[in-house]
């Protein structure tokens, strides 16, 4: 079992890291077969946008029609909790260390950036998925679109 470097992260920091990871991860279709981040990001953004209004609508509808308050509150809390689950998953994923296969791929992309004359930041002692997202975002901006084909 791998030891995560940030086990002492609070739940609020995990949600913040999830939001940052969601903004950082490049939304490229070629990454979708390998990484679930594209799907989780799309669903989480959808949930952030539409679940709070749905929760309010459900709550007011149940109250206006004389329904019971308990199930209405439970449904509203469930609807508001869905985007939080996505942010939680993304936050936990962001602080997870890269497995050995992705670590090799991380170093190859980093090497391609340095070969292209781009300054690269020093490597963390244990690279995480967040550092991979930062690197991929930068590679998509500064390298040609075929850099993934060579890897």
From Swiss-Prot:
The chain crosses the membrane at residues 46-66, 69-89. Disulfide bonds: none annotated. Keywords: Cell inner membrane, Cell membrane, Membrane, Transmembrane, Transmembrane helix. One of its GO terms (cellular component) is plasma membrane. The keyword Cell membrane applies. It is found in: Cell inner membrane. It is a multi-pass membrane protein. InterPro entries: UPF0208. Belongs to the UPF0208 family. NCBIfam families: PRK01816.1 (NF002493). This is UPF0208 membrane protein YpsIP31758_1444. The lineage of its organism: Bacteria, Pseudomonadati, Pseudomonadota, Gammaproteobacteria, Enterobacterales.
């Amino acid at each position: 079992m791998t030891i995560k470097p940030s086990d002492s992260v609070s739940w609020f920091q995990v949600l913040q890291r999830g939001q940052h990871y969601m903004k950082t991860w490049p939304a490229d279709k070629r990454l979708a077969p390998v990484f679930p981040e594209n799907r989780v990001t799309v669903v989480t953004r959808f949930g952030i946008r539409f679940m709070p209004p749905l929760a309010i609508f459900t709550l007011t509808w149940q109250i206006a029609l004389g329904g019971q308050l308990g199930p209405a509150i439970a449904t509203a809390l469930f609807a508001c909790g869905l985007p939080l689950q996505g942010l939680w998953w993304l936050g936990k994923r962001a602080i997870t260390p890269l497995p050995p296969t992705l670590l090799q791929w991380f170093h190859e992309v980093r090497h391609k950036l340095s070969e292209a004359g781009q300054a690269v930041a020093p490597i963390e002692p244990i690279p995480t998925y967040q550092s991979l997202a930062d690197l991929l975002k930068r590679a998509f901006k500064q390298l040609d679109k075929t850099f993934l084909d060579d890897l």
